[in-house]
Amino acid sequence: MFIILKRNILINMSFLLNLGELGTFFADEIENLENFTNWISSDFINFINAIVNDIKNIASFLGQAISDIPTFMVNIATNFLTILQNFVQTAISTIQGFVSWFEQQIVGAFEFLSSIASDFINSAYSFFQNVANVFAQIISGVISDFLNFFGANMKHISNAISQLSQFLSPFIAPITIGKFLPVIVDKLAEILPEIEIDLAPVGLGGKIPIKFGEIIKAFAETSVDFLNEIRTELATTLKEFIKEPFISDFKISAREIFNEIGLGDLPFADPPFQLIGRWVAVRSFDEVKDHLRETILLTGYPAWFTNAYLESPVNDFVPKNPLFRPVGIRDLITGSQYGILNISDLEKYAYNNLITPKTAKLMYQNQTARLLQRAVEQGIRQFVITPQKAYEEIISNINLTGKELFLKTFTLEYEYAVQRIVRQFLRSLLSRALSNFGKPYLDFKYLDNTIAKLFKDLGYPEEVRTVFDTMITQSQLIDTNQLLLRQLQQIVKLGIFNEKKIKEELKANKFNEQVALQILESELQFAQLQNTLKEYQFKLKSFLISPKDVEKDLKHLGFDSAIISALIYENQVEQLIKFQLTNIESLAKKGYLSLDEIKKQFKAIGIIKEYEDAFINFINQELQISAFLTILKSQLRQFQIDPKVAEAELKKLNINEYLSNQIIQEEYNINIAKLHLSVLETIAKTLYYDQQQLSGELEKIIKDKTALELYIKKFYYEYIYPKIVNYHVQLARHGILSDISKLPKEVIDYEIKPALLTYQTTLEIEYIKESLKDLEIKPTDAINELEKLGMQKDIAQLIVNTYIPTFYNVHTIIQNIIEGQLYKVGKVPINLGNAESELRKLGIPDSQIKILLDQYSTTFGLDIWRKHLPSISIIENAIKYNYLDQKLIEYSFIPSELLNLYINYYQHLLVGQEVQSFKSEYITALIYNYQNLQLENLLKQYGINEALLSVIKLFAQVRKIVLGLQELYLTPTKALSISEYVSNPQQLLQKVFTEFQIPQELQNTYFEYARNRRVSRYVNEIITTINLLFEKHKIDLGTAQSYLQQLKKYGLTDEEIQLIILNWQLRSAY
């Protein structure tokens, strides 16, 4: 900046006359510096934060400090300008000739001294920087040794000490330089010389001293303070950073020791009361009260303070325990408004919210006033209530509470709502009245009275009524004149035009006579010409007039030639051509005209060749299709062609699907249906069809309902009816009497009723058998019932003896006796109570009751005994935990030989499971070349033989190779990344893509991507250079744009070029 300032002084010394403008001199440099520092304060800070969270404080401080660099540089410029301005103002006030003398005499000396000072400062700073770097290396070594020795015994951070030392080393040199910098500046200021400017040559007398040291200090003061702040903050943060891992390691180790010796609740730090509150909120206060007491006592706070946190809360709005949330003033106000609380409670509890009763009352009145305000505002907006009345309603009711308050509020809202609805109806009537004004069928006097009444009911201001009356007047005038003009136009269209009468009418209704009369005259002329055209159109269509006569007459009337030609063509020529074409088409379709004759007649009419060719092609197709269809129909009628083949032939000719279906239906389907019906009658005589099948088959053939019904009845009575009778007989044999009313009486008496009686008798006998089994009937009663059915007595007695049940189970009794001896079951105390009498009530024979009771009691006792015998899982747990009691073994009923064998097996199994669990871990160890012979011997001992162990080792070797290939083998993605750093990327990518069989099109895409990615940095630098050249006006926009176009082959798109150019244009306007 000193060199730039010197150059500007040499170019134009006139700036000394207006030194205040020098403040803009640094604008460009400061702007560039701001852009740089903005990047530093955003992207660079984000980068620092992403690298390591431990220096967050440093990064934050650096970001804030660096962001102040623009202000710092402006301060430097301002200080320099202040010194220079004071000096110049002193000299310029004496004589203007000083400028010329200063330019000739001093500039050279200033340049010389500045050059010497600059070289000296740079050399001095380099010397001090080297000294600082030496000290930094020494300090870095000391810190590294200290950390390594001190952290060797820290088990949690010992492995990270070397990384910690490497992380701290880069920060030592900046801190050392920052420490030396203030001394460097002071020493430089003392060393730099002081010169004097003698003013005698210009006749002023005296000397002006210039102290370079002071100038250096003026420039360096801000930067030294700034760097001191950075150094201090950096050193403080690094000290905390170094200290924190050791403190944390010590706390973790101490915490583990305290937990192991039972002092886990002894805290190292007291939690804040906010955290205590959240902790208590998710737990029960009574549950954690004792622990809370110990924690609070650790704080050392006085008893009046801590006792409040330990006191049980009061079930009131003021709980007297700070951990419990008291009621808020707004909740109290709301409760008072709803009547839940009295207004006196509000004043009482307001004091607890540090609010005086008077203030609380004011807050209540304010909130009540807002509630009432919302209600009365509805009335004001609808002109239902005046502002004065609305204000009085609010003020007079602000002290109401509870029911009185809300009854008042709801009453106001209800009244306003009712009046609002009424006014909506009135406004609707008023709007309709406004839209209907001006209609000649209305009684204006009656309507005016109605409007006046509506305005009175609505209470609108007089100004609204005035505007409304004006709109009514204008509406009347416009509607009346529109109706009148429309009627005059309708009359004129009929050819009636009385000019005098029309003028009088227009004048009487305040029309613009000239314009209105011109409109009506135009309407008359249009009607006359339209009627003339209709006459000529009729004559042309009827061939009553020649085109020449029409053309002559219409030209005389002033019609344009184009309109005349269109009229003649549309109404005569077109009709004549259509008539001729219709006759030619009719004769050609019948084959009465040859192709040459058709062409001759088309040529005479003037038909174009395209239509002629299309017409002849159409006629040929029609004649061909017509002949083909005649032959095809005959073949279908005679069944000489399959309908599918016929359908295919029709499709070849592009015959419409509906027409094809019609031909096949009429010529084939109807005839084949007749033949099918004949065949069906023959089949029905020998094969069985039910009614539904018969109906279905007949419906396929017969579409007439009468014929269909006759055929169905015929087949029904011949084949289906006998089956129906058999069906009802089968149902009766199973006790089902369906609807047989339609069957003849003979069939019912001799076939259905006997079958039903047989079923009923069989069912009653089965019922008696089941009743005997369930003891629901006595044996004597069962015999009597069987005899009533007509059964002989000896057979009835046999049935009864057979079906009386035996309730006890001999096999179960025998099993209970044997198992009782085996399990050594003692007597199980069972109280049978009145079970014997209850069984007797059920009808169980006395001979079975005692046996039955003994059977169930012994079974019950054995079930209890079995349920509690030691199972195999209990024996396994006993082996696992070395508790094999003799009684446990005895009651398990496992033979001793088997038990000893199982104990040995299970113990071996437990050890083997643990040994084999090392298998996957040992494979991982083998991958990293670690072999343990002791573990291999154990594996061999517990199920892993030599062959399987060899397989495990082979698996580890293969896994190691796969792991290496996964890390180092070139996949397409890795090849794309590595291609940026190899000498022949194209060859590398080609080899990898070929190996993975990547499609050629995709290969070309990624070749281009790899190339553009490799050169993208240089492309960005070129774009930046083009940007700088354009901003410095070294190249014009066209040249810059041509350079950008050359970069399109490296991936730059037209959209990106347009955005870059737009950015240049925006920056040029900045």
Curated annotation (Swiss-Prot):
Alphabetical list of PROSITE patterns matching this protein: UBA
Effect of V645I: In strain: Isolate variant XX
Effect of E392Q: In strain: Isolate variant XX
Result when mutating S837P: In strain: Isolate variant XX
Residues in UBA domain copies: 477-523
Phenotype upon changing I830V: In strain: Isolate variant XX
Consequence recorded when altering E699G: In strain: Isolate variant XX
InterPro entries: UBA
Effect seen on changing T582S: In strain: Isolate variant XX
Effect of mutating I106V: In strain: Isolate variant XX
Result of changing K1032R: In strain: Isolate variant XX
Result after altering L963T: In strain: Isolate variant XX
Result when mutating E240Q: In strain: Isolate variant XX
Effect the entry attributes to changing D749E: In strain: Isolate variant XX
Consequence of changing Q274N: In strain: Isolate variant XX
Name of the protein: Uncharacterized protein 1070
Source species taxonomy: Viruses, Adnaviria, Zilligvirae, Taleaviricota, Tokiviricetes
